[in-house]
Each structure stands twice: as C-alpha cells, then as structure tokens.
Amino acid sequence: MKNNVKNLIEFIDHSPSCFHVIENARKQFLEHGFMELKEKEYWDLEEGKSYFVTRNGSSIIAFHLPKKDFQGFHIVASHSDSPTYRIKEQPEMSVEKHYTKLNIERYGGMIPETWFDRPLSVAGRIIIEENGQIKDQLVNVDRDLMIIPNLAIHMSRSSNESKQLNPQKDLLPLCGGNLTKDGFEEMIAKESGVEKEDILSYDLFLYNRMRGTTLGINEEFVAAPKLDDLECAYSSIEGMLNAKLSKDYVTVCAVFDNEEVGSGTKQGAGSTFFPEVLKRISYLCGKNEEEYYMAVADSFMLSADNAHAVHPNYQDKTDPTNRPYINEGIVLKYNASQKYTTDANSAALVKYLCKKEKIKCQVFFNRSDMLGGSTLGNILTGQVSIKAADIGLPQLSMHSTYETAGCKDLDDMITLMESFYELGKEVQI
C-alpha cells in the first residue's frame, strides 16, 4: 500500500465525525509549527509564520503569511462532513420489551440501502458541565455497537424491486436488548469517562465501522467511508504541509462543515467565517479596505470536492463526450447553471499546473438531461468574489457509506495542491 493511500485511510479511520476531522487537522498543523488563533481574541501576525483558526470545532482555516505586503490569497477549500444519521435526544425506542433501537434523522443525501447489515458505531461531541464550566469533549465509541438489520427476503418477496425507505421506520439502528431508559446516554458517559448527569447535550452521528482498504488486481483502487470529501480535505492539508509555500501570496487551507446540508450555518461556507478571516489577515497586515479588495482581486481558489467517475455498470449515466475515469487524473467540473465556479480563465490555471506537473486532467459535465449536485465553491465566491475553479477526484458510489476512488489520483491531487500553494506572482491569473 502506497504511503499517501495508507495515510489517507488512517486519517479517515481516525475521523469518524466532522469534529474528529478538524481535531486531526488541528493536530497536524500544530505538529508542523502552526499557531492556533482564537476568534474572540486579538491576533498578532508575524511574517513567515503559519496559523489556523477553528469555528464550532467542525471547520478550520489555516494560512501561511509570507510577508505583510502580500499580493493576494491562494486558497483550497473542501469540507469535513459526509452524509450520515444524527442521533436525536431521548433516542431509546423499546420494541416489545426485547429490543432497543435508536431514534435518528438523516443528515445529507445518502444512499440509505448502503447502511444496512454492517457494523456501525457513534461519534461526535458531548457538552458537559465540569466544575461550573461548560466544556465540549469529543467522543468515539470505538467498537462495533449497532446495526440496521434488513428484512429477510422471505418476509418481503418484493424487496429486490424498487422500494421507498421510510427513515423513521426502516432505518433505525438496533443497539441492544431491552435497555433501561437513558441506557444510551449512560453508555456514552461511560465511554467518555464522565457522569451521565454531567452531559448537558450532544451532537452524535452514526458512522460505518468498515476500515478503508486497497483493492483491484494491482491494488489500483482505494475504498473507504467518507472519500467525499475527506480525500480532498486530506490532500489540501498534505499539500500545504509539503509545499515550499509561496513568497508572494497568503496560502490558505479551508475545511468547512455542513456542505452536505447547504452550508448555511455559522461554520459553513455560506457564513461570515471565510471573509472575516481574510479581512482580519489583511487589516492586521496594515492594508486598508481598498487594498483588501485589491488583494481579493489578485486571488484564486480551488474548490476541491470529488467528482463522479464513469460507472462500469451504468456507462450511460455520464455525459457522452466528457467522461472522467478513475486513475486518469484530476477532474475539472463545469456547470452552465453555475453550480460550479469553473470558467475558461480558471480552468486554464488548473490545466497549466497539471501540464507543469505532468498530471492528467479530465473534465466533468452532467448529462444535459440530468440535474447534478452542488458544492461549496460558488457559495464561497458569493461571499468573497475570488476567481475559482471546481476540481475533484473521480470516484464511484458517491454518498454511499463506502466509496471507491483511485490510488494514483490521490498522489496527483497532492502534487497539484503543492504546486498551487507554491505559485508566485510570476504567473498572472
């Protein structure tokens, strides 16, 4: 198993919730000398230093300041969340005094059938009271805890036909026998090393316990949960940590929460988090408002979110002339309805970098008779008017609880990120 793929699998394995994604990113940045900033405190920025700031524990913006008289910003944006199920308050539901299942609700647009008949567990954060203080604490029940059992075909002869699943009835996970009321919270408290009475609230989500792996005759594929979009988040972090960062531009690695539900939260791409950080950097470097706008005009962003590869069993679902394949390079994403930010100018820079690094570049369009998904690029450029391109890695089974992508593509994406972060003012965008 190649190093990048091995490290990606480790990153995903240790990131069972969006909060864990950001905590793992935070640890990596700290290990590489980045300094943590707090939004509610004064910032003191020095030339040649690197920093990061988090919001809600589920979004992070890291940046390197080469000099105070910088040209603009070079940004890579991705997201920390994936489709899953959120556990409701008072979740225990007794079934005929013999089973206990949990009350959950959908988060994002998942493929529900992929959650059946596999070991699941729960992770996220709890909010506790400790010595008169309110604190948050990450929790991961690191064992096979529950399952969503299918109905046997003998009891549903039409189960292989199209079926509409009811998330309030058909998708509730079995977590035990006849548990006492509050048994779930008692278990969470025990796993977290706190008293149940100290838990004030929680944000807890289901996750697939299947570990990532490589497969294929030549181990050319990587399969894992949450490849959308942790593959791009991981690549952007690695690219920033590995690159000889630009001496002209502030390089920015941003990972936002809540992309899968529209980004309209205080920590999402549609919030003030992104423009506020860029403005604080600019103003603390002595730029006035006009100079901030000048810096924005000389900036560029890569919105990094995975793309649909041609499916081997459903080839007709892809555009007839623009057909991305796994392990055939970075994907540039276009959409006439402007769900993606790519235009001729921004695509040219991506193609230039791919040519420079000898990386293949592919193109994605939706079929003209099919609606596609959206991502965070156009939401961010609606907040700050930055030239941008939407890119991603080709993958299969997007929004399944277990997805498939290419090993070579991961290497190429990290190389592209490094090259982008190293760009100086010699290349006019």
Each language-model region and where it sits:
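N-terminal hydrophobic/helix-forming segments and targeting peptides
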Residues: 1-429
